[in-house]
């Protein structure tokens, strides 16, 4: 399901019309791909082309051939020849993106998961392809919209990039947007969408993908709809939300280093969060120095976030997933009901639940001299939250 978000689409097209390169950042299930496909429809297929870089990034030669074959936009110079080596293949890919033409106006490429060109760095002569791509796009007459799920990595890549790049963080859905989605599932019930939207929005943290899963479940419940029960069904071993969380969890972990240690830290934070570096290193039984490295790798793939020198899951639904599926035995019905109930209380009644659910502060957790302070973003790029 492609969620229409007109105001966000206007922000992107306004950025394009101003000569900038919008860079859309959002986590798993945030609607990046849906937004790019909607933009392709809005801009028109005659002058825009969506490309999934993650799917195409195999070898430079095969990637070039796949993109040239699939694209409706072609260069005016004629067919792209066969490259002699990997470096030439990547260069011709940049030439192709740079030289595309359209009879209906300036061509626009919508590059999904553009960071995945890093795959080419495994080949001879290609050491800094991400920076090469950014440098070429910055001066290209072609228009581009970029998207990625890796927020921290994009910020680092664009830290010294030209001001033409405009970072746009995809906002979470609000209750009004979820209500519009809900009409597709519970339209036949009086006040159904309006009644369900606030609870669904809070439970999924505004995630379009998770909202769609819950609303699908609610639509099949009949008259007695219960968002918490729908969440419990979705996070069951065979649930759609479980499958999506597992995909996100494993994808991000496999893009980081230290797989086993990182899973250990996520298990610790699933039990109790937020925790500081010293508390995590004690529980992990590793030195603060090693633990600090592990945490930086988790931050790099946006699995954890540090606020005030304390670490917590970036996505609360992933924390619920790890609490349920981080052990050797799948959860039973009673465990799922209990965990989902506790999660729902923190999301639906945060003010009332906070005093009862907040963990007791550690008695002897002195500030660790090895802890790094929070860094303010350093970048010349335009950023919109």
What do these predicted regions represent?
Residues 285-300:
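Short amphipathic alpha-helical interaction segments
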Residues 89-151, 159-160:
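Conserved Walker B catalytic segment
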Residues 48, 58-80:
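Conserved NTP-binding/hydrolysis module of P-loop NTPases
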Residues 170-195:
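Conserved small helical "lid"/interfacial subdomain of P-loop NTPases
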Residues 212-288, 335-340:
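Winged-helix-like regulatory helical subdomains adjacent to P-loop NTPase cores
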């Amino acid at each position: 399901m492609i969620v229409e978000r007109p105001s966000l689409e206007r922000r992107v097209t306004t950025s394009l019309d101003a000569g900038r390169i919008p860079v859309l950042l959002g986590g798993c299930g945030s609607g990046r791909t849906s937004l790019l496909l909607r933009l392709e429809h809005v801009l028109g297929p005659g002058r825009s082309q969506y490309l999934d870089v993650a799917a195409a990034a195999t070898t430079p030669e095969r990637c070039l051939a796949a993109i040239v074959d699939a694209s409706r936009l072609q260069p005016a110079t004629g067919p792209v020849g066969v490259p002699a080596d990997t470096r030439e293949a990547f260069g011709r890919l940049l030439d192709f993106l740079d030289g595309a033409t359209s009879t209906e106006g300036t061509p626009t490429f919508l590059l999904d998961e553009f960071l995945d060109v890093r795959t080419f760095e495994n080949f001879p002569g290609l050491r800094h392809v991400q920076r090469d791509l950014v440098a070429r796009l910055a001066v290209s007459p072609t228009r581009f919209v970029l998207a990625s799920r890796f927020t921290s990595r994009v910020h680092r890549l664009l830290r010294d990039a030209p001001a033409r790049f405009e970072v746009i963080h995809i906002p979470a859905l609000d209750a009004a947007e979820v209500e519009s989605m809900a009409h597709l599932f519970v339209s036949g019930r009086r006040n159904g969408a309006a009644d369900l939207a606030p609870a669904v929005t809070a439970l999924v943290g505004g995630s379009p993908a998770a909202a769609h899963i819950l609303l699908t479940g609610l639509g099949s419940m009949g008259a007695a709809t219960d968002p918490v029960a729908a969440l419990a069904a979705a996070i069951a071993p065979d649930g759609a939300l479980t499958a999506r969380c597992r995909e996100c969890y494993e994808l991000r972990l496999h893009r980081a280093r230290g797989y086993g240690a990182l899973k250990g830290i996520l298990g610790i934070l699933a039990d109790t969060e937020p925790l500081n570096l010293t508390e995590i290193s004690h529980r992990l039984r590793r030195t603060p120095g090693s633990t600090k490295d592990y945490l930086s790798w988790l931050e790099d793939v946006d699995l954890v976030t540090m606020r005030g020198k304390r670490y917590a899951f970036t996505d609360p639904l992933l924390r619920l997933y790890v609490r349920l599926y981080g052990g050797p035995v799948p959860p039973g019905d009673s465990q799922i009901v209990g965990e989902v109930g506790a999660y729902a209380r923190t999301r639906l009644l945060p003010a009332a639940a906070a005093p009862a659910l907040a963990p007791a502060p550690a008695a002897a957790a002195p500030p660790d001299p090895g802890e790094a302070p929070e860094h303010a973003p350093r970048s010349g790029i335009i950023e919109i939250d």
